[in-house]
């Protein structure tokens, strides 16, 4: 059978919910025709479980391998760049690889905003706030085309990293620093799960609201204007307390966010930095249980391997200006290919 027949069989099997057969047929099609993009796309879909289910590490790795083949054949497929980035960062925890992935995407699609936003988000999660701010600021400086939804996300993320970047460098938790004060804070809070934002809101807002309602009911006149004024006062209090709850949530749960960053660091590097007493704590288990299945499987392999972070380890970020060099190279190549009459 030809590649096209296997491809059609894969589509039929996928429509029937037989993902194993679909993957087998799609793989057969790509063996016969390694440049069959549609077959590779079906293979990606067949490797991953149905919507709403989490993939295993093996499924995520197989899908990622196929995605890499697709973008190698057609670098303009932003949807596949996005899927590959999400598989790396969200499902497998490969944050450092995801940074290089998105910079590679930007070399091929320099006018797209998505790679910059994704890199900034990853850098912020890693605690590299200054780098994240530079990436986001470049969107505004270069006057890139941004949709309304993307602009809101960019603006919110930019405000977040601007505030975080104002911290002193020693205050920003870096998991690879053994004697950072963040480890002390983690040990102090590791016996309890993090406090939820809704609980903070209820504990702070409800007593104040009850007191205000009692006072308004006692001293306000029974009229429509009084009802409107009372409603406005209550609404303002709720909005203020919601904002305060978000701020207190960040402050009270800073040790939990630090531990999350340390766990992400281990997943990204493959080295262990968390001590055993922290790894068996309530806080660690709470965070671990809320990670994707594939992420947990990969982390367990890293823990079993038990390779400690080397003393000479250094964070190596991609060259964030490589897309400019690539654009210059492409421009020079086009110029060289022009006929002499056109050059004149």
What positions do the PLM features span?
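Alpha-helical linker/edge segments of TPR/alpha-solenoid repeat scaffolds
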Residues: 50-57, 93-94, 129-134, 158-190
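Alpha-helical segment of the N-proximal tetratricopeptide repeat
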Residues: 1-32, 42, 48-56
